[in-house]
UniProtKB/Swiss-Prot annotation:
KO phenotype (gene knockout): Decreased homologous recombination frequency, but unchanged sensitivity to genotoxic agents and efficiency of T-DNA integration. Differential expression of several genes. Compromised ethylene-induced H2A.Z eviction dynamics. The double mutant ref6-1 ino80-1 is insensitive to ethylene (ET) and exhibits reduced levels of EIN2 associated with a shift of the chromatin landscape to a repressive state at its locus (e.g. H3K27me3 and H2A.Z).
Name of the coding gene: INO80
Record's keyword terms, sorted: Activator, ATP-binding, DNA damage, DNA repair, DNA-binding, Hydrolase, Nucleotide-binding, Nucleus, Transcription, Transcription regulation
Pfam families from the UniProt entry: DBINO, Helicase_C, SNF2-rel_dom
Organism name: Arabidopsis thaliana
Protein name: Chromatin-remodeling ATPase INO80
Helicase ATP-binding domain sequence ranges: 598-769
Any one Gene Ontology BP term: DNA repair
Cross-referenced PROSITE patterns: DBINO, HELICASE_ATP_BIND_1, HELICASE_CTER
Biased composition (Polar residues): 38-67, 1491-1507
């Protein structure tokens, strides 16, 4: 029903009997020729009440709404589906009978249900078709189920015909039945029309009889008015009889319902119409799910009044408590005519859409499909055409490509045969290579055999030479074996022939033996000729010099074939005794050495005395020279060549043990040497009363003054520390070899330092006739032993034995543990140190500079010179970091002038301990004396002054009337009263100087009468005021832009600024009190500071620098008075507690054990100073906190010096323990910069020390060694490893500390022997400081590997730890074990050409004494290194320390140096050094390590300078 026509809710039945709308109601006209009816019987009610949803009014069946209960609203799609075009359906008789039977059966069932459920009585059911029933719809309408069962129209058969909507079509049309109908009155004027054929169908279809049908009650649910009733009656559109083909007669039209009722009244027996409304029907309008049956209008949340059926729970006068539930939304029912029209519009729209959209769409689809078919057909045609063309083209192409294919086949065959030929060539090359290798192996075997024969030749030649030289002494010296005589050769070697086997000798061996004998004979003959010629010439010179008699040659026969400990030239029996000229006692092994030297001299052999360092080689050589003078009457001249550091030692030892032998110390400047050369006159030599018997000089001077020494025929040449001639290509070696001397003796503790070539150089130097081929010697011995030491390979023991056999006749080697049982033990301890945090940062930063893997891969194993230098530079930098970070750039401290004399005070307390602050023991050079009488009568009597009359005058009266220091008198003295205002002051009185001191008259008077402490306090305060003026000036300069240029204004501003900065001298407690500004003290009040405080706090650091490093400082002027009270007064003033607090921040009193402030009231000046804090700090407070109890005067920062180096911290602890144990220490370092740091450390610790390095002169060396040996108060001797490790006797020390190890481990061994030698009475301990997990460990490991050869060759010979490093050595120092293994594996994979190129390189890395690396040619290096002095000459000291160099009398030495340079007598090493092209490691890296040749380091001698 239309909501607008709904009756009011308060009277739902108000318009029920309003007949006016009913009378005016017009029956709708039929719109179609098709008869429409209401809902068919398939719209069966499925509601909860179980009723049939079919509305009938006055016998007419109303059309049902086919909407489902599940659906909430009608949509356009549903409207389109529910079309109104219902077509007539034809039903056959059989079909009709079946439907009728089913209808009757359902009617019975529903009748039973109605009887069982009285409130829900059902009407007669409508027949239901099984063809087009609504299956998915729930029956119902908008009228809430009002029931009108049947219409009493006569067309019953047509009414029961099922109808479908437009979407459901049934082609079976039920035929119309033309029987007379029967009528069933159900009461209330409602009559049902029964078809006439019903009785006929009762029996056949088992239908209920007419009498069995009882209709009791019918309920119409919902609200009904006449309007809706008229619409229901009008819905019966077809009342006429249907024909079989579905075309019925048209229904008559009525103007109104009243007219229709009048027309139908004649046909109805009971035309009455009655309507009964029951409570159940009224209640049936309550929606399902309502809480109750009472209707209430309630305002919803959206603000709309809605009707709710509620249940009243509680009711009062002014309130109701109800329970409600929202009813389901009712569906709005449209007008059937509107629905039909809407459905027709939808059909029309559908057709329009079909015409407009679907037809066009299908046309497009058809067109597209047709186009696609066309395209596919064309494509297929193109494919077929292409295939055909390909076949045709292929047929044409085959003849054309035949030549191409033929050429390709030919080319493939050619490549195949080329490959085959190449493989065959490689196979042939392989076979040839194998054949060549086999031939090479045969050649090597043959060559090895030849080498063995040559070696045997050399060994036999050596022994035969020794045998001939030994037997030569038994015969006439003038006789010689004839060269062509064979019999003497067979006679002299009976033992050798007997020793050989009796079997037939090989002709080749026999020939070799013959060559050996003749070669030995030739060598003996040549040596004998040389010796005879020298003796003849010597005799002539002696006769010329009026010698007393002929030579008395005494020889000792016999030899034994023993090891180096007992050489083959050692006689079995000896008559040699200790010479009387030797004022000493020789030990047993020294007597054997003297005996061996005598025997070698008699045989004409030169020898090498290679005893271990410290066994007295110098003593044996001096005893041998005394033996020649005493037994053979040979008084020289003897030439002793030694390093510059031991020249004084030789002179002292000879004068001590052989006072009868005169020495000529040939060293000094050019003028001194010129005077000394006057004694080198052949006419004055060769006799006992000659001017000298032994000339002592250095290697460098010997090469420099070579032309003067060639004139002399030296009877014997002794070379001490003979490793200085280790290179046969050096100028030094060639010069000494060219000297005319009868015999040569080499003294060395390490005859082999770097390689086996050096051993050959020494052997060739002593026996040039035998050892004349260096290549063969190097090929026989050098390779195997060196490879074993470096790489751990197998060592040929037979090869080592052959080397021993060659060395037997010419070398005597003893070690300490074998020959000296009373020598003290030596213990070596390696102390591992940790790197400090600063060192670790430096070390890691330097190590990260380069990647070794990238370096190797980028060069394919080839290391360029520049990259090797870079790597070596990294190694050197890492070593410097391990020693001390300040080696890069020394943090030189600035020192003020300390005007005082510092005496040797007690040892300082341990670092960091807080001890009582005491004065450092310094004393002011200014001392004034006060007579005792003056002190007692004037100074001490402070209360009264005595006059000559004897009457006492009070001090106040005296100062008032007789004080010349009154401010008034001083002012008058400065400004005389007679000078006018406008006149220029031409002069002033006695106190006119005070204006220059910036002192007022009051301040001058105060200082004149105050005590010493008050003067000191005033000076500090006055200095602070001066500093405050500087602050004002700096502040004013920064504010110049805001100030006027007027000077007067600037002065005023400056004065005001100074007044603001000056603290108040008068302070009260009220001024110091904090006053709150509110009811409670704000928490942020402490954060607010004045601008003055901020300014003063900002300059605190700058002020500290001025305070702690003043320009000058001096102890108080010493006052000397013989009065005891004066001494007490001075001491009291100096140690006054408040004065100490002022200087150091606190004062220790006797009442407390710790530092605290004195309890007494401070001096006013101290109060004034304290009031200016934080500008003013205690003068020495910070220094005391840093340095502990040390004196405040320091030129460097020892705390930073110690904490920055882990080694120095370890050394500090070690030296304290050694000092406590009364030990004496030799401290060796390599770099001079490191020695400077150690020297500063010694000064800080107050250790007495001496320092010896390359800058020390010969005289200074002698004096320092002597002082250290005789003075027990000297605790430490600082030495350079290279300058102080040769020939110095320092047995007074029992501890050796290596702060840094040298690149050459031989130098470290020599340094150890400075203390561990004969004359040492204490056990020697050697400490070596090594940083953990650094490059130092690898350097030490490398040295230990090379020391292994020393044990292999001759128990003390071969040490390859030299100053020259190859690329592999440098890289190995920077890599760990894993990386080294990988690098070695990659190096093995290199081609042979690369390895050969690397082997052919003759450049090596040289490390000088300063730790710098240069790349030099190997030949030049050998020549220059062996031509230079291990220690620099005293007359030309070269040191990086300019202060020490300038201190060695530059005025006296400058002319000498100028003359030497003018005469061209500079050292060859220096000349070569300047000309040689060197490459510094710092060219590509940091300039700190510059090694380039400059004026300052020109001619630098690395062997003579310490690092």
């Amino acid at each position: 029903m239309d909501p607008s026509r709904r009756p009011p809710k308060d009277s739902p039945y108000a318009n029920l009997f309003d007949l006016e709308p009913l009378m005016k109601f017009r029956i709708p006209k039929p719109e179609d020729e098709v008869d429409y009816y209401g809902s068919s019987s398939q719209d069966e009610s499925r509601s909860t009440q179980g009723g049939v949803v079919a509305n009938y009014s006055n016998g007419s069946k109303s059309r049902m709404n086919a909407s489902s209960k599940k659906r909430k609203r009608w949509t356009e799609a549903e409207d389109a589906e529910d079309d109104d075009d219902l077509y007539n359906q034809h039903v056959t008789e059989e079909h009709y009978r079946s439907m009728l039977g089913e209808h009757v059966q359902k009617f019975k069932n529903r009748s039973k249900e109605t009887q069982g459920n009285p409130p829900h009585l059902m009407g007669f059911p409508v027949l239901k078709s099984n063809v087009g029933s609504y299956r998915g719809r729930k029956p119902g309408n908008d009228y809430h189920g009002r029931f009108y069962d049947m219409d009493n129209s006569p067309n019953f058969a047509a009414d029961v015909t099922p109808h479908r909507r437009g979407s459901y079509h049934d082609r079976d049309i039920t035929p119309k039945i033309a029987y007379e109908p029967s009528y069933l009155d159900i009461g209330d004027g409602v009559i049902y029309k029964i078809p006439p054929s019903y009785d006929k169908l009762v029996a056949s279809l088992n239908l209920p009889s007419f009498s069995d049908i009882h209709v009791e009650e019918f309920y119409l649910k919902g609200t009904l008015d006449l309007r809706s009733l008229a619409e229901l009656m009008a819905s019966d559109k077809r009342s006429g009889v249907r024909s079989r083909n579905g075309m019925g007669e048209p229904r008559p039209q009525y103007e109104s319902l009243q007219a229709r009722m009048k027309a139908l009244s004649p046909s109805n027996s009971t035309p009455n119409f009655s309507l009964k409304v029951s409570e159940a029907a009224m209640n049936s309008a309550i929606p399902e799910g309502s809480a109750g049956s009472t209707a209430r209008t309630i305002l919803s949340e959206g603000g709309v009044l809605q009707v709710h059926y509620v249940k009243i729970l509680e009711k009062g006068d002014t309130y109701e408590i109800v329970k409600r539930s929202l009813p389901k939304k009712l569906k709005a029912k449209n007008d059937p005519a509107v629905i039909e029209k809407t459905e027709r519009d939808k059909i029309r729209k559908a057709w329009i859409n079909i015409v407009r959209r679907d037809i066009a769409k299908h046309h497009r689809i058809f067109t597209t499909f047709h186009r696609k078919l066309s395209i596919d057909a064309k494509r297929f045609a193109d494919g077929c055409q292409r295939e055909v063309r390909m076949k045709v083209g292929r047929s044409y192409k085959i003849p054309r490509t035949a030549p191409i294919r033929t050429r390709k086949i030919s080319r493939d065959m050619l490549l195949f045969w080329k490959r085959y030929d190449k493989q065959m060539a490689e196979e042939r090359k392989k076979q040839e290579k194998e054949a060549a290798e086999a031939f090479k192996r045969e050649q090597e075997q043959r060559e090895s055999k030849r080498q063995q024969q040559r070696l045997n030749f050399l060994i036999k030649q050596t022994e035969l030479y020794s045998h001939f030289m030994q037997n030569k002494t038994d015969s006439n010296p003038s006789e010689a074996l004839p060269i062509g005589d064979e019999n003497p050769i067979d006679e002299v070697l009976p033992e050798t022939s007997a020793a050989e086997p009796s079997e037939v000798e090989d002709p080749e061996e026999a020939e070799l033996k013959e060559k050996v004998l003749r070669a030995a004979q030739d060598a003996v003959s040549k040596q004998k000729q040389i010796t005879d010629a020298f003796d003849t010439e010597y005799m002539k010179l002696r006769q010329t010099s009026e010698m007393e008699g002929p030579l008395n040659d005494i020889s000792v026969s016999g030899s034994s074939n023993i090891d180096l400990h007992n050489p083959s030239t050692m006689p079995v029996t000896s008559t040699v005794q200790t010479p009387e000229l030797f004022k000493g006692t020789l030990k047993e092994y020294q007597m054997k050495g003297l005996q061996w030297l005598v025997n070698c001299y008699e045989q004409g052999l030169n020898g090498i005395l290679a005893d271990e360092m410290g066994l007295g080689k110098t003593i044996q050589a001096m005893a041998f020279l005394a033996h020649l003078a005493e037994e053979k009457n040979i008084w020289g001249p003897f030439l002793v060549v030694a390093p510059a550091s031991v020249l004084n030692n030789w002179a002292d030892e000879i004068s001590r043990f052989c006072p009868d032998l005169k020495t000529l110390p040939y060293w000094g400047g050019l003028q001194e040497r010129t005077i000394l050369r006057k004694n080198i006159n052949p006419k004055r030599m060769y006799r006992r009363d000659a001017g000298f018997h032994i000339l002592i000089t250095s290697y460098q001077l010997l090469v420099t003054d070579e032309k003067y020494f060639r004139r002399v025929k030296w009877q014997y040449m002794v070379l001490d520390e003979a490793q200085a001639i280790k290179s046969s290509s050096s100028i030094r070696w060639k010069t000494l070899l060219s000297f005319n001397c009868r015999n040569r003796l080499l003294l060395t503790g390490t005859p082999i330092q770097n390689n086996m070539a050096e051993l050959w150089a020494l052997l060739h130097f002593i026996m040039p006739m035998l050892f004349d081929n260096h290549d063969q010697f190097n090929e026989w011995f050098s390779k195997g032993i060196e490879n074993h030491a470096e790489h751990g390979g197998t060592l040929n023991e037979h090869q080592l034995n052959r080397l021993h056999a060659i060395l037997k006749p010419f070398m005597l080697r003893r070690v300490k543990k074998d020959v000296v049982s009373e020598l003290t033990t030596k213990t070596e301890v390696t102390v591992h140190c940790k790197l400090s945090s600063r060192q670790q940062a430096f070390y890691q930063a330097i190590k990260n500079k380069i990647s070794l893997a990238e370096l190797f891969d980028s060069n394919r194993g080839q290391f360029t010179d520049k990259k090797v230098l870079n790597l070596m530079n990294i190694v050197i930098q890492l070593r410097k970091v391990c020693n001390h970070p300040e080696l890069f750039e020394r943090n030189e401290g600035s020192s003020y002038l300390y005007f005082g004399v510092t005496s040797n005070s007690l040892l300082p307390h341990p670092f960091g301990e807080l001890e009582d602050v005491h004065y450092s023991g310094g004393q002011n050079p200014i001392i004034y004396k006060i007579p005792k009488l003056l002190h007692q009568e004037v100074l001490q009597n402070s209360e009264t002054f005595c006059s000559s009359v004897g009457r006492g005058i009070s001090r106040e009266s005296f100062l008032k009337h007789f004080n010349i220091y009154s401010p008034e008198y001083i002012l008058k003295s400065i400004f005389p009263s007679d000078s006018g205002v406008d006149q220029v002051v031409s002069g002033s009185g006695a106190f006119g100087f005070s204006r220059l001191m910036d002192l007022s008259p009051s301040e001058v008077g105060y200082l004149a009468l105050c005590s010493v402490a008050e003067r000191l306090l005033f000076s500090i305060l006055r200095w602070e005021r001066q500093f405050l003026d500087e602050l004002v000036n700096s502040l004013m300069e920064s504010k110049d832009g805001d100030l006027s240029d007027n000077n007067i204004e600037r002065v005023k501003t400056k004065a005001v600024t100074r007044m603001l900065l000056m603290p108040s001298k008068v302070e009260t407690n009220f001024q110091k009190r904090r006053l709150s500004t509110g009811p409670t003290r704000p928490s942020f009040e402490a954060l607010v500071i004045s601008h003055q405080d901020r300014f003063l706090s900002s300059i605190k650091l700058l002020h500290s620098a001025y305070t702690y490093i003043p320009k000058a400082r001096a102890p108080p002027v010493s006052i000397h008075c013989s009065d005891r009270n004066s001494a007490y007064r001075v001491t009291e003033e100096l140690h006054q507690p408040w004065l100490k607090r002022l200087l150091i921040g606190f004062a220790r009193t006797s009442e407390a054990n710790g530092p605290r402030k004195p309890n007494s009231f401070p001096h006013p000046l101290i109060q004034e100073i304290d009031s200016e804090l934080p500008v003013v700090q205690p003068a020495l407070q910070l220094t005391h906190r840093i340095f502990g109890s040390c004196p405040p005067m320091q030129s460097f920062d020892p705390a930073k010096l110690l904490t920055d180096s882990g080694k120095l911290q370890t050394l500090d602890i070690l030296l304290k323990r050694l000092r406590a144990g009364n030990h004496r220490v030799l401290l060796f370092a390599q770099m001079t910069k490191m020695l400077n740091i150690l020297e500063d450390y010694m000064n800080y610790r107050k250790y007495k020390y001496l320092r010896l390095d390359g800058s020390s002169t010969i005289m200074d060396r002698r004096d320092m060694v002597r002082d250290f040996q005789h003075r027990s108060d000297i605790f430490v001797f600082l030495l350079s490893t290279r300058a102080g490790g040769l020939g110095i006797n320092l047995t007074a020390a029992d501890t050796v500390i290596f702060y840094e190890s040298d690149w050459n481990p031989t130098l470290d061994l020599q340094a150890m022997d400075r203390a561990h030698r004969l004359g040492q009475t204490k056990d020697v301990t050697v400490y070596r400081l090594i940083c953990k997990e650094t490059v130092e460990e690898k350097i030490l490991h490398r040295a230990s590997q090379k020391n292994t050869v020393q044990q292999l060759v001759m128990t003390g010979g071969h040490v390859q730890g030299d100053d020259f490093l190859g690329a592999a050595d440098v890289v190995s120092l920077l890599m760990d074990d894993a990386e080294a293994a990988q690098l070695e594996q990659k190096f093995r994979e290199l081609p042979l050409q690369v390895k050969d190129r690397q082997k052919k390189k003759t450049k090596r890395i040289r490390i000088d004494a300063e730790g710098d690396a240069t790349l030099e040619e190997l030949e030049d290096v050998d020549r220059q290194d062996n031509g230079q002095e291990p220690l620099e000459e005293p007359e030309k000291p070269k040191s990086s320390n300019k202060k020490r160099r300038a201190a060695s009398n530059p005025k006296a030495r400058a002319p000498q140096k100028a003359k030497e340079e003018a005469n061209g007598e500079d050292t060859p090493q220096r000349t070569k050094r300047v000309k040689r092209q060197t490459k510094s490691i710092n060219e590509s890296l940091e300039p700190v390590f510059s090694a380039s040749v400059t004026e300052s380091n020109k001619g630098f001698d690395p062997s003579s300078s310490a690092n």
